């Protein structure tokens, strides 16, 4: 099975790439966890599609499986839900050598990882992402968290998985909106690190949106390689890793202000990238031609490029809660060339100029 390795010394782990191979998962997981006792966390959307396949494969490999199904969506990523899951883990008899398996999208991965990171001060964690967004972003890198009412991912930890399993066949069950949400993050990687990837998406957009297997595999694997490289260089987001937040400063603000209900994460990031580029254009970091190229690709995908019914003053307030803003400064990840970004301290009045 094809795989890459995320290099974190003694905590390195593989990302496996497969197609419709859930029957092999039990054998693979067994190689990477310490005991056969495991706790699957999934949601009501994913449960009828893949739970039985995973459960059967694990039981063939003699796993003792317990599980919990949670409501789909960002509103499940709360301290209250985490407590419920932690209590279920305890009631199910999980010990320090047990594991948690996340079967689902980014929300499931985030909250399952948070449970794994905090239960008995940290137990083994396995990621099986079932959305394009989770495959290329949240399943890689070890950031796990839950939301507070006033901000996204405020309570969390760094807890690396023991392995990640990416099955391209699951993308066939996603609706177009979910595919586009993941594509927003892939476009992000092209802007911040590898402009060849950006150009590949420009040149193959139609086939990507048609879910051509070879095109999807290329952009998913390339995205994981890019994020893996960045994470291996800066695991705890002390410097370089913060560039992964391109588009997320305004994106997270939009999500919080709309109660995580109006926009899915990738849509908010797409809007955030457009506004980060507008800010970079105003400040002279990029020219009009560069801005138009990025705006054009995002628009061609069908992703939103602007927000509705929000006040700029409220967006500023939400931005100030952003974890990237140390001290009183407002930090933005801004493009400054092809495949290159920088973290820039920006004055509040400059941000207000580009917000509508």
UniProtKB/Swiss-Prot annotation:
EC number: 4.2.3.4
Chain positions recorded as NAD(+) binding sites: 106-110, 130-131, 143, 152
Pathway recorded for this protein: Metabolic intermediate biosynthesis; chorismate biosynthesis; chorismate from D-erythrose 4-phosphate and phosphoenolpyruvate: step 2/7
Cofactor requirement: Co(2+); Zn(2+); NAD(+)
GO cellular component, one term: cytoplasm
Broad class of enzyme this protein falls into: lyase
Cofactor binding note: Binds 1 divalent metal cation per subunit. Can use either Co(2+) or Zn(2+).
Catalysed transformations (reactions): 7-phospho-2-dehydro-3-deoxy-D-arabino-heptonate = 3-dehydroquinate + phosphate
Keywords attached to this entry: Amino-acid biosynthesis, Aromatic amino acid biosynthesis, Cobalt, Cytoplasm, Lyase, Metal-binding, NAD, Nucleotide-binding, Zinc
Entry's localization field: Cytoplasm
Short name of one Pfam family: DHQ_synthase
Protein's UniProt keywords contain NAD: yes
InterPro entries, A to Z: Dehydroquinate_synthase (IPR050071), DHQ_synth_AroB (IPR016037), DHQ_synth_fam (IPR030963), DHQS/DOIS_N (IPR030960), DHQS_C (IPR056179)
Annotated residues for binding of Zn(2+): 185, 248, 265
GO molecular function, one term: nucleotide binding
Domain of life: Bacteria
Gene3D superfamilies listed in its UniProt record: 3.40.50.1970, Dehydroquinate synthase-like - alpha domain
GO biological process, one term: aromatic amino acid family biosynthetic process
Function: Catalyzes the conversion of 3-deoxy-D-arabino-heptulosonate 7-phosphate (DAHP) to dehydroquinate (DHQ).
Assigned protein family: Belongs to the sugar phosphate cyclases superfamily. Dehydroquinate synthase family.
PANTHER family: 3-DEHYDROQUINATE SYNTHASE
Protein name: 3-dehydroquinate synthase
Organism: Thermoanaerobacter sp. (strain X514)
